[in-house]
Each structure stands twice: as C-alpha cells, then as structure tokens.
A protein has these predicted regions:
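Transmembrane beta-barrel strands of outer-membrane/channel proteins
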Residues: 34-40, 96-104, 147-153, 192, ...
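Short coil turns and loop connectors of transmembrane beta-barrels in diderm outer membranes
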Residues: 28-30, 62, 94, 124, ...
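Residues that define the transmembrane beta-barrel architecture of outer-membrane proteins
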Residues: 48-54, 122-126, 143, 182-188, ...
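Outer membrane beta-barrel transmembrane domains
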Residues: 108-109, 234-352
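Extracellular loop and loop/strand-boundary signature of outer-membrane beta-barrel proteins
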Residues: 113-118, 173-178, 213, 294-298, ...
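Residues on the lipid-exposed face of transmembrane beta-strands in outer-membrane beta-barrel proteins
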Residues: 54-60, 100, 128-134, 149, ...
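Long, hydrophobic/aromatic-enriched structural stretches that serve as scaffold segments
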Residues: 78-158
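Repeated loop/turn-to-beta-strand initiation elements of outer-membrane beta-barrel proteins
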Residues: 63-67, 138, 198-200, 235-238, ...
C-alpha cells in the first residue's frame, strides 16, 4: 500500500513539473553557475532537530527550461499576486535558479524504535525549488520569489541517514517509521521577499555591506520574518549575490553570480546576520493531511523564533568559492526536551 501511494505521489510530481515547463524571453546566460550545500549538525557536535541536509543549485536560463522545473507555476503565482508590478516601472534585471535537495530531522534519542512523544518528531523533505531574483540597481533593492515542491515522509530518508551515519560511525536511527507523514505526502511552499542594501563601499579594497530583508512564506512553513545581514572583507561579488537569510533550515538556492574583478585579489570575507520569525504553522512538526504517529499541536510549537549565523567565504580559484558557517536557532517547540538547534554547513560554488 505504501509503495502504491508513493508511486502516485511521484506521478503528481512529474505532472506538475511538465505543466511548469515554459520558456520566457529573458536575456540571461544559459548557465551562470552551480552551488552545493552540505549541512550537518555533527559539525556542531550535535545530532538532533535539523540533523542535516544536502542541496544542489543550478542557475541561469536553464533553470526555466529544464524538464524538472517549477518555473511556470512560480511565475504564474507572481503574476496572480501582482508581484511584477513592484519592479516593472524601474530598470531591473532577473536571474533564475533551480535547486534539488533534501532535509532530515530527528529527536535526540535515535536508537529508540518506539514513538517518542515529548521530543521533535522524525521528519524529512525531498524537494525541488525554483527561484527568481529581480534586482533594481538604481534603488539598491532586490526581490526573491521561490516556489518549493516536495514530499514529506519518504522511506528514502532512513536509508540516507543510515549511509551518513555509517561514514561517521554514529548510532543508527531506528525510529523512522514514526516520521511525519510516514509513507510519503506531497507538500509545497511559496516564498516572497524584498531586500534593501544600506552600505556598499565599492571602491575600497575591503568593504562593508549591510542589508535588511523582509520575507513571507506560505505552505509547509507558514511565517513572516525580518533579517539583518552583514559581510566584510575583500568582496568582488554584488551585494544581492549572498542570501543567507533566504533559508528554511537549508539555504534556498538563489542564482550564482560571478565576481566583477578577476584581475585583482580573490574574494575573502566574513559574513553574519540574524533574523526574527513569527511562524504560524510547520508541517515538519505539526504534520499535514496524512496521519502522523508523532506530531505537535499548534500550542506545543514556539511561534516566535530567532536565528543567528556566522560564516566565511574564500575564493580559492577564479569564481570557485568555498564557505563554512555556523547557524543557531531558538527553541522550536515547548517542553523539557526542547533545545537550541545548532548546525554547520559547507558551501562550494562555481560561477561562470
């Protein structure tokens, strides 16, 4: 029965992608780069809550043209809500990306096969996300629109974590039968954000950048949030090219941008930021339509959340960059087993 349901969900996934596959006449290079995100809480000496994620982002015009793309639906939603009117009167340009990834969540005691009702539920999400970045250079303003579609509760989550824990010689997780939407359930999230650059001293060898962003999500995470992001050092990429605030645990894939100074020293900078979020609903903790053995009620999850992050980026070859970061969040649910989730991540990117 479970395999039959998962087969039906895969069919829904393929149909949605085929319907979404449209090409728009936007002047943009076919391939502007790629980015690989690797998150894991073992790097932060933890093994619970958001325990890890991996995502590959491909950017450029190809993100609109790939068979496995949600660009048509995302663009239709923007048009339905009149998002295009926000930037249409002023000079602007647009960049696109598509991301494929997965995220895993566990309680603290992963050796226990029985349901654990007073800790975070097991959870997983396998997803595809399409993003459009619109930049208005004269106003130092940028907009992000992202549509994420995926599946909660797939059996593949257990096998992936077992493989990772075999490599790291960690305990085997035995409770995946109790995960949110166990057996598989489709889900989605639509994200809109606007960001404003406040400081950008382009002519200095080392410079500061400071920007604010406001974001709203509707779907498997429904929330509103505001953030402040900063970076300092030897910077050759535009202010809108780094978006640590655009994340739902793992960073949602934004377009990759090349540096504007390939004759001078390569990039080397630090970055940091913080955000405040008011979350109305989280499918990864409260479940969705399908029955979940372990899930929280609305009263058991924290509504007001805060996050902080700190990272560093090094361009070790022309337009090839590596980043390492730490990220921490306030408690996401109530009770004695609630902790402050902390995780670390490695990002490798190549821009063209």
């Amino acid at each position: 029965m479970r395999k039959t349901l998962q087969s039906r969900y895969y069919l829904i996934f393929i149909l949605l992608i085929v319907i979404s596959n449209r090409t728009y006449g936007i002047e943009e290079k076919y391939n502007t780069g790629w980015r690989l995100n690797l998150d894991n809480d073992i790097l932060a000496e933890s093994d619970r809550d958001y325990t890890g994620g991996i995502a590959l982002t491909l950017s450029g015009r190809r993100a609109q043209e790939y068979l496995f793309s949600l660009e048509g639906v995302r663009n239709w939603l923007d048009g339905l809500l009149g998002i295009h009117r926000r930037y249409a009167p002023q000079p602007h340009f647009q960049l696109h990306s598509v991301q494929y990834g997965t995220m895993l969540f566990t309680p603290e005691d992963i050796t226990e096969p029985a349901p654990i009702f007073d800790d975070r539920p097991y959870g997983s999400l396998f997803f595809i996300a399409n993003t459009e970045l619109t930049v208005a250079p004269s106003d130092d303003k940028a907009w992000l629109s992202t549509l994420t579609f995926g599946f909660l509760g797939l059996d593949a989550a257990e096998y992936i974590q077992k493989a990772i824990h075999a490599l790291t010689d960690s305990d085997v997780a035995n409770g995946w039968d109790n995960q949110i939407s166990s057996g598989g359930e489709p889900t989605l999230m639509y994200t809109l954000s606007v960001q404003q650059n406040h400081i950008d001293r382009v002519n200095s060898a080392r410079r500061h950048e400071l920007k604010t962003a406001y974001e709203a999500n509707a779907g498997f995470s429904t929330d509103v949030n505001a953030s402040l992001s900063w970076r300092w050092g030897r910077i050759n990429t535009p202010w809108w090219s780094i978006n640590p605030q655009h994340a739902e645990y793992i960073n949602l894939g934004t377009p990759v941008a090349a540096g504007n100074n390939q004759t001078g020293p390569r990039e080397l900078y630090v970055w940091a930021g913080s955000s405040v979020k008011y979350r109305v609903y989280s499918a990864l903790m409260q479940g969705q339509f399908r029955n979940s053995i372990v899930k929280f009620s609305s009263d058991e999850v924290e509504k007001l959340l805060a996050q902080v992050w700190l990272g560093a980026t090094w361009e070790f070859a022309d337009n090839i960059r590596g980043s390492f970061f730490y990220r921490a969040s306030s408690k996401e649910f109530k009770g004695p087993n609630a902790h402050y989730p902390v995780w670390a991540g490695l990002i490798i990117s190549r821009a063209y």
